[in-house]
Amino acid sequence: MKILYSLRRFYHVETLFNGTFVLAGRDQETTGFPWWAGNARLINLSGKLLGAHVAHAGLIVFWAGAMNLFEVAHFVPEKPMYEQGLILLPHLATLGWGVGSGGEVLDTFPYFVSGVLHLISSAVLGFGGIYHALLGPETLEESFPFFGYVWQDRNKMTTLLGIHLILLGLGAFLLVLKALYFGGVYDTWAPGGGDVRKITNLTLSPGVIFGYLLKSPFGGEGWIVSVDDLEDIIGGHVWLGSICVLGGIWHILTKPFAWARRAFVWSGEAYLSYSLGALSVFGFIACCFVWFNNTAYPSEFYGPTGPEASQAQAFTFLVRDQRLGANVGSAQGPTGLGKYLMRSPTGEVIFGGETMRFWDLRAPWLEPLRGPNGLDLSRLKKDGQPWQERRSGEYMTHAPLGSLNSVGGVATEINAVNYVSPRSWLATSHFVLGFFFFVGHLWHAGRARAAAAGFEKGIDRDLEPVVYMTPLN
């Protein structure tokens, strides 16, 4: 039988007690990996590995389509999306599908179409995955040399990297096209409480776009997560798409330099570790974006951010007490600081009380009430609009933390019954996934480096309990 692995490399792998167990023709003797090692059995079988990846893509797209239709079926137009536990429809709404002024859902048919298209796509991918896993050639090198590869072929690997970068760049341009030409996207900052609009004045200045990367991640700076302008977001995607496409072309046309050949480990497991590391970074950045940013993730769909809910409570009580005759400009709270308004460390007028820690919040319902030196007292007294009051009252009771509401410092009740903000779900899931992808990155990077150095030992199995158990057969 043709041995596809180095005996020296895999001498440590524990074998099954029943050596005859074979799954899809990939037994341990042939590959050096047991059945539960999954795709590791296919490291040197490019055709079968293609099948596994296409089938995996089919599963991902199937989930997207099925969950999309599930959310459409359960959607209640009279309630905000964030009160219904939705995580996919808010993304479609943010892209401008089916919504109008103030984030009101006008038509759910685009959401239905999206779900059906994903289901159809998943079927095509599923058939392709099954074909390549069961019927297609085991290796692509002989039949389709363009698609074939050897993990150690550095030039081929950077060509594949280039193709992936071009596809990512084209994905970024799809958002740009949607925003510029195909109906626009939802802008939470549009006058009067948000609306769908086409982006007409892209920000392409490298100083502005790359200035975000140079910002501090702390406080009012907020690194790239601080972006609060759709022109900057879409312009950033123009830059990102261009860099990815040009970088992809460059990687296809060039061979890796000598320093890159020396610096990197060139093996299947090493590439897996690099990919997991990149996905981990994506996960952590997405976590911060969905938790703090209310422009890319409008509060009309995802619910308020933590600081936004806190500031909304201060504004709601200021409006209420002002109508009852309180002088909100001079009233003192129990600490001697301003009860409703006070000054920040840098002199701006901000909301008083517990919410002062969130004084650098920017939100579309609040910014019209600011002047050159922070909150403007005369605007607070005269210019408040009903939509601002309604929105702040709604956000006050839908904090993403499900935090305790308080009146006069006494905790009274949780903000809403059975309410978990989509921001909480999305931020937590992306943080946890980002963390585990990082652990996977470290694990596979360590294994790849050890294998490259020639001293891979794996786990010492002499003391493993399973060795002394009765064989399964």
UniProtKB/Swiss-Prot annotation:
Protein name as annotated = Photosystem II CP43 reaction center protein
**Residue ranges annotated as propeptide in the record:** 1-14
Instruction: Give TM segment ranges.
Output: 69-93, 134-155, 178-200, 255-275, 291-312, 447-471
Residue positions annotated to bind [CaMn4O5] cluster are E367
| GO CC annotation, single | photosystem II
Q: Which Pfam families match?
A: PSII
InterPro entries in the record, alphabetically? PS_antenna-like, PS_II_antenna-like_sf, PSII_PsbC, PSII_PsbC_sf
Residues modified as N-acetylthreonine are T15
Q: Which family does the entry's similarity section mention?
A: Belongs to the PsbB/PsbC family. PsbC subfamily.
PTM per UniProt?
A: Phosphorylated in both bundle sheath and mesophyll cells, phosphorylation increases when cells are grown under high rather than low light regimes (70 vs 900 umol photons/m-2/s).
Function, as annotated: One of the components of the core complex of photosystem II (PSII). It binds chlorophyll and helps catalyze the primary light-induced photochemical processes of PSII. PSII is a light-driven water:plastoquinone oxidoreductase, using light energy to abstract electrons from H(2)O, generating O(2) and a proton gradient subsequently used for ATP formation.
Q: Which UniProt keywords apply?
A: Acetylation, Chlorophyll, Chloroplast, Chromophore, Manganese, Membrane, Metal-binding, Phosphoprotein, Photosynthesis, Photosystem II, Plastid, Thylakoid, Transmembrane, Transmembrane helix
The species is Zea mays
Record gene name: psbC
- What's the protein's topology in the membrane? Multi-pass membrane protein
> Mind listing the GO molecular function terms for this protein?
chlorophyll binding; electron transporter, transferring electrons within the cyclic electron transport pathway of photosynthesis activity; metal ion binding
Q: Where in the cell is it found?
A: Plastid, Chloroplast thylakoid membrane
Q: How is the cofactor bound?
A: Binds multiple chlorophylls and provides some of the ligands for the Ca-4Mn-5O cluster of the oxygen-evolving complex. It may also provide a ligand for a Cl- that is required for oxygen evolution. PSII binds additional chlorophylls, carotenoids and specific lipids.
Q: What is its main location?
A: plastid
Might you name a Gene Ontology BP term for this protein?
photosynthetic electron transport in photosystem II
List of residues that carry Phosphothreonine: T15
Record note on quaternary structure? PSII is composed of 1 copy each of membrane proteins PsbA, PsbB, PsbC, PsbD, PsbE, PsbF, PsbH, PsbI, PsbJ, PsbK, PsbL, PsbM, PsbT, PsbX, PsbY, PsbZ, Psb30/Ycf12, at least 3 peripheral proteins of the oxygen-evolving complex and a large number of cofactors. It forms dimeric complexes.
